[in-house]
Swiss-Prot record:
One GO biological process term: histidyl-tRNA aminoacylation
A GO term, aspect molecular function: histidine-tRNA ligase activity
Catalyzed reactions per annotation: tRNA(His) + L-histidine + ATP = L-histidyl-tRNA(His) + AMP + diphosphate + H(+)
Keywords: Aminoacyl-tRNA synthetase, ATP-binding, Cytoplasm, Ligase, Nucleotide-binding, Protein biosynthesis
Gene Ontology terms: cellular component: cytoplasm
Disulfide partners: none
InterPro entries: aa-tRNA-synth_II (IPR006195), aa-tRNA-synth_II/BPL/LPL (IPR045864), Anticodon-bd (IPR004154), Anticodon-bd_dom_sf (IPR036621), His-tRNA-ligase (IPR015807), HisRS-like_core (IPR041715), HisRS/HisZ (IPR004516), HisRS_anticodon (IPR033656)
Protein name as catalogued: Histidine--tRNA ligase
Cellular location(s): Cytoplasm
Subunit and interaction comment: Homodimer.
Amino acid sequence: MSISGIKGMNDILPSDVETWQFLEREAHRIFKLYGFAEIRVPVVEKTELFCRSIGETTDIVEKEMYTFDDRSSNSLTLRPEGTAPVMRSFIEHKLHALDPVSKLYYMGPMFRYERPQKGRYRQFHQIGAEAIGVDDPMMDAQVLAMLCHYFDAVGIDNVELHVNSLGCQECRPQYRQALTGYLESRLDKLCADCQRRYQTNPLRVLDCKVPACQEATKDAPSVLDLLCSGCNDHFAQVRQHLQELQIDYTINARMVRGLDYYTKTTFEMVTNQLGSQNAVAAGGRYDGLIKELGGPALPGIGFAMGVERLVLMKGEQQVQPPRPDVFLAALGEAAGQKAFALMYRLQRLDLRAEMAFTGKSLKAQMRRAGKLNARYVLMLGEEELASGQAQLRDMDNGSQEPIALEGIEQALLEKTRGN
């Protein structure tokens, strides 16, 4: 009996990997343009880290984390998101002492025990970025500009930027009170999850996708009406900077985030292409998180993108693997040995070279070269070995010409690099 993979944890097959690598490669390129440096953190952290950062009453902590005790009875958790581990590393290694402004990015797998569906999996991958040490609204705008730049670079244009402000410790309690007062008379219209959220995390009721809950909250008070003057000014400046950069955005006062650490600016990149999983990137400011985790009182802002959702959005634009530069078709044992050694030398010159390893007919080898979409085929047999000249076929136009075996590596290098 064969062993299958774990539900909601998917294999990334070679036919898809090129698209994944393209998305990752563009993240490296774009983020470095904005002064961000990559950081890599473990996939397992102490459970306490996520309880203190994400919030003990969030859906993630209450229902979705993969948590276990190790053999020393330490409670550990597979990371459900990337910001908290990056902040833990930032504090532990005192990165603020090296530079008062830290701009970091990461990529890798995250884990949540959820019902698998399109765009939502139990192991999923994120690309994220964090800017620490600056509370200026201009930094919010730069992070959003970088995110928009990335989407342009990877060719995903059917997205909209939604922005909101969740206020701060001074004004959010007033909004929470206004919202719970509004919801109190409508509790019977809320789903079971939202009735629980009413007690623990009422802002999350606004994010519920259940139609009855959306109807019940359609006239709920707006957080933007209860911002303190500082948060109101901050949000106004963020919007002004976005306008200066000619970045389109939509104010979405109902947009809340599922993690407790967010303050002030929050945002999402949304699409209508993925059904209910309409956010392909999301983030916000978290000015109290680092202090909450035992570090200095430093502000921060960041975001994460779901790579699986980006891949889905690429759709028909899937990135194709690079074609082989040369396919070596050999007939006979001596020619096969010569081709094998030549293939290695070509690969050492950074040429993509392939050959058939089982003694197939020339016709079969040509079919293989065609399937691989090789640019050239080098045909080598006993006659070619004796004459010192092989045959080189251009697979794009069908032309064929002799090519000397002496110095063939340099000749093929010039030939392929010239096309």
